[in-house]
Amino acid sequence: VIEPKCYKYEGKKCPPDINPVCGTDKRTYYNECALCVFIRQSTKKADKAIKIKKWGKC
């Protein structure tokens, strides 16, 4: 399990590159930044704890 490096994306637009990550919530995210945006925008406490399960699609 990998901690996403969300600090890299603070106040920036997500890059358009497709580099899928599989979250510990078993969802595939477009890239690490997209996962970080989801975590930041979510109001659910459980979502704040999502990590990267693996690089690539779930």
Curated annotation (Swiss-Prot):
Domain Kazal-like residues, every copy: 1-58
Main location: secreted
UniProt note on tissues of expression: Skin.
Any Pfam family: Kazal_1
Leader peptide range in chain numbering: none
This protein's record includes keyword Disulfide bond: yes
Keywords: Antibiotic, Antimicrobial, Disulfide bond, Protease inhibitor, Secreted
GO molecular function, one term: endopeptidase inhibitor activity
UniProt entry tagged with the keyword Cell membrane: no
GO CC annotations on file: extracellular region
Entry-linked InterPro entries: Kazal_dom, Kazal_dom_sf
GO terms for biological process, alphabetical: defense response to Gram-negative bacterium
Assembly: Monomer.
Function text: Has antibacterial activity against Gram-negative bacterium E.coli ATCC 11229. Shows hemagglutinating activity. Inhibits prolyl endopeptidase, but not trypsin, chymotrypsin, V8 protease and proteinase K. May have a role in mucosal defense against microbes by interacting directly with their membranes.
Protein known as: Proteinase inhibitor PSKP-1
Organism: Phyllomedusa sauvagei (Sauvage's leaf frog)
